């Protein structure tokens, strides 16, 4: 056999070795020559392909397995498929054993990322080793081509090639990716026959993971119980499955069993079981697991820290969660999102928005869930301007068509009284689902656009989407706020006929609809259909009695409420106000004395207004705590004078205390929404004035704000505890029905 001997008498410009024919060697000189050109500062195509082609033309044969492997490794390092193809051509020319060359070429092609060429080589092989089958199946699954992986597995079985532990541990993942449950069960049976289910931990772990993804935690647990040697991966897979399926008690039990069996948890075990503790609000076990995590050295692991943070937030221990967050050296997107969403869920919206701003300053890119949480924080506080800025961030990062960020925007604009802007966002969503439809329907409902809400509900039905309990509540609320009594009754009857599970909240909404329409007997009759009427249901009916001044019925309902919750302050306050509105001052004194004895306090009426991204708070009767109180009172007096010129007269029935008439007038002038509006007008805020109130707007303030909107020629949007009121040109969107 001929050989090319290297000497340095060749190209002096680049110091390349020359070759001459020698008959004593093999591929050593060839390999040295190949390595020399591979090390030059030239492109991979030049170093591998061109030089290799030159050698292949001049060489007679290449026969050493070691040298072929060396050349293929060089191609893998350079990720050169063209080099592999050249080697394959020369292997065929040299008569290299096909069963060896094929396997090596498939392996090299896969490592270079060309699965299709690897498959082409594989299909041309007459004999295929199990290792080659496994490699190709594993790479297909890794590159999300599970369907092809399963087809290859079927071909393997057809060719009477028995799978081994590596085949099965790979293909079980493909089955779960494609939801091929029946085929997965057949292959599980094959694993049992081959003795791999019990004896091999890789197969056992893959089976547990597969059944978990099918949502079959019972089957996953049976597999785990049969595996002889259990490890952390196996048990963690089951705990993750329990946690994801909401079987949190079982997740905690599995973790406890793990400790009994002396299997050391890893950071992912801790992360999963802590989420379950949070879902259960099981702070006892949560703190115990936190202690174990510290003892095991996993306290600084990011996955464990994030789950610990989430657990404390779900248990409403905000201070503990903040301490955990401060210990995270480099918080990532997931950590920030967990903190922000948890703070919003715990009613710490202002803090959540502060943390969101810190996240943006740290240049951590938010995801759609982060943005959705920040937007809900703005919507809960009616922070319109702040929300609009976050809308800009949503657009910047390309989430304006995302359903989660989109729903957050719809919720924001809906709760800031801008249903038209909410609808614009809704119409741009790339995917309409039940969540986005519910959010838009609720936006219409709370802003008094009942017909639009019902049209959207009809669209939902036509799209074939199944309404859920939120949909039903939003639709009934739309009818309630728009005085669509008959439509609401028809819908409620249809929901009952369709056997939709109706909750106490749905019944409370219908009781409110009928009660406000003056159909109190029907409303009371409806309560008899509820198996366990709760306080909300009875209070709703009691509120209707107050509106229509039905004292006798109210007293009867009050007795029922106090049987459920003795000393319920909301009920006593409602009854006190009802007695006051009907002139029964002796009963008012009696109720207030009872409240005093029970040390009950009425929640103060409060209003908020956002000015230049800063929220200002006003409390009824508090005239001097605000730094601009002098200017506010001057402006309020001027507004009251102008409104009286246009016919405003104080409605003294809204004062539930026995006092002089002039004192009643002063009391009405000091309501929190009046103070907030006076401040906003004094600050000369452009555009609409947006007020948020924690209680219902009283009749007197409602009448006054209507006139002020006409005086100032400004829209005033007031969101109270019940709904939105859009005041324009002396009228309100509610039609004086709230």
Curated annotation (Swiss-Prot):
Q: Annotated region Type DYW motif: where?
A: 645-738
Q: Which UniProt keywords apply?
A: Repeat
Show the segment(s) annotated as Type E motif: 537-612
Q: What is this protein called?
A: Pentatricopeptide repeat-containing protein At5g65570
**UniProt source species:** Arabidopsis thaliana (Mouse-ear cress)
TM stretches of this protein: none
Q: Does the keyword Cell inner membrane apply?
A: no
The entry lists its GO molecular-function terms as: RNA binding; zinc ion binding
- Family that this chain belongs to: Belongs to the PPR family. PCMP-H subfamily.
Which BP terms in the Gene Ontology apply to this protein?
Answer: RNA modification
Alphabetical list of Pfam families matching this protein: DYW_deaminase (PF14432), E_motif (PF20431), Eplus_motif (PF20430), PPR (PF01535), PPR_2 (PF13041)
Residues of the region (Type E(+) motif) are: 613-644
The segments carrying the PPR repeats are 98-128, 129-163, 164-198, 200-230, 231-265, 266-300, 301-331, 332-366, 367-401, 402-432, 433-467, 468-502, 503-537
């Amino acid at each position: 056999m001929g050989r090319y001997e290297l000497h340095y008498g060749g190209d002096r410009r680049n110091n390349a070795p020359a070759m001459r024919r020698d008959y004593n060697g093999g591929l050593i000189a060839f390999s040295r020559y190949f390595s020399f050109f591979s090390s030059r500062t030239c492109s991979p195509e030049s170093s591998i392909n061109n030089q290799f082609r030159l050698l292949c033309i001049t060489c007679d044969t290449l026969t050493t397995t070691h040298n072929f492997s060396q050349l293929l490794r060089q191609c893998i390092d350079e990720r050169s498929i063209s080099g592999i193809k050249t080697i394959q051509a020369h292997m065929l020319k040299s008569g290299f054993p096909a069963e060896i060359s094929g396997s090596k070429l498939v392996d090299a092609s896969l490592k270079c990322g060309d699965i299709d060429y690897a498959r082409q080589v594989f299909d041309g092989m007459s004999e295929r080793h199990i290792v080659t089958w496994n490699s190709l199946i594993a790479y297909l699954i890794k590159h999300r081509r599970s369907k092809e992986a399963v087809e290859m597995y079927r071909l393997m079985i057809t060719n009477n090639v028995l799978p081994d532990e590596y085949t099965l541990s790979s293909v079980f993942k493909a089955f779960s990716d494609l939801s091929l449950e029946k085929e997965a069960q057949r292959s599980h049976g094959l694993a049992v026959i081959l003795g791999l289910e019990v004896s091999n931990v890789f197969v056992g772990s893959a089976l547990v993971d597969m059944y978990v993804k099918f949502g079959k935690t019972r089957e996953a647990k049976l597999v785990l119980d049969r595996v002889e040697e259990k490890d952390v991966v196996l048990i963690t897979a089951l705990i993750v499955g329990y946690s994801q399926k909401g079987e949190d008690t079982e997740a905690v039990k599995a973790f406890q069993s793990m400790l009994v069996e002396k299997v050391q948890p890893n950071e992912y075990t801790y992360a999963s079981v802590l989420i379950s503790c949070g879902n259960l609000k099981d702070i006892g076990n949560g703190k115990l697991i936190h202690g174990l995590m510290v003892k095991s050295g996993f306290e600084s692991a990011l996955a464990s820290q994030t789950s610990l943070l989430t657990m404390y937030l779900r248990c409403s221990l905000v201070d503990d969660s903040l301490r955990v967050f401060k210990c995270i050296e480099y918080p990532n997107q997931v950590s920030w999102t967990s903190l922000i969403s948890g703070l919003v869920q715990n009613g710490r919206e202002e803090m959540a928005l502060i943390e969101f701003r810190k996240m943006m300053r740290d240049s951590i890119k938010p995801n759609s869930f982060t943005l959705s949480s920040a937007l809900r924080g703005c919507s809960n506080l009616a922070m319109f301007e702040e929300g609009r800025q976050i809308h800009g961030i949503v657009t910047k990062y390309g989430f304006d068509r995302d359903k989660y960020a989109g729903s957050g925007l719809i919720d924001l604009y809906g709760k800031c009284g801008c249903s038209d802007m909410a609808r614009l966002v809704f119409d741009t969503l790339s995917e309409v689902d039940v969540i986005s439809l519910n959010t838009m329907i609720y936006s219409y409902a709370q802003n008094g656009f009942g017909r639009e809400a019902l049209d959207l509900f009809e669209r939902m039905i036509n799209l074939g989407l199944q309404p859920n309990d939120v949909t039903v509540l939003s639709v009934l609320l739309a009818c309630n706020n728009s005085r669509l009594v008959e439509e609401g009754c028809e819908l409620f009857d249809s929901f009952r006929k369709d056997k939709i599970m109706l909750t106490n909240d749905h019944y409370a909404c219908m009781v409110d609809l009928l009660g406000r329409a003056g159909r109190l007997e029907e409303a009371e009759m409806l309560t008899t259909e509820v198996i366990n009427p709760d306080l909300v249901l009875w209070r709703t009916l009691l509120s209707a009695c107050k509106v229509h001044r039905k004292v006798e019925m109210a007293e009867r309902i009050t007795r029922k409420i106090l049987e459920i919750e003795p000393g319920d302050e909301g009920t006593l306050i409602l009854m006190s106000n009802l007695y006051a509105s009907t002139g029964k001052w002796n009963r008012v004194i009696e109720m207030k004395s009872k409240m005093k004895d029970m040390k009950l306090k009425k929640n103060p009426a409060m209003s908020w207004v956002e000015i230049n991204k800063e929220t200002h708070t006003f409390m009824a009767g508090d005239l001097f705590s605000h730094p601009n109180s002098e200017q506010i009172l001057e402006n309020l007096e001027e507004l009251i004078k102008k409104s009286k010129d246009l016919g405003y007269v104080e409605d003294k029935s809204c004062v539930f205390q026995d006092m002089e008439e002039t004192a009643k007038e002063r009391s009405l002038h000091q309501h929190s929404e009046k103070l907030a509006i006076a401040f906003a007008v004094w600050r000369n805020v452009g555009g609409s004035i947006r007020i948020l109130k924690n209680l219902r707007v009283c009749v007197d303030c409602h009448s006054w704000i209507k006139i002020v909107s006409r005086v100032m020629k400004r829209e005033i949007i007031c969101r109270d505890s019940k709904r939105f009121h859009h005041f324009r040109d002396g009228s309100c969107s509610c039609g004086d029905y709230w």
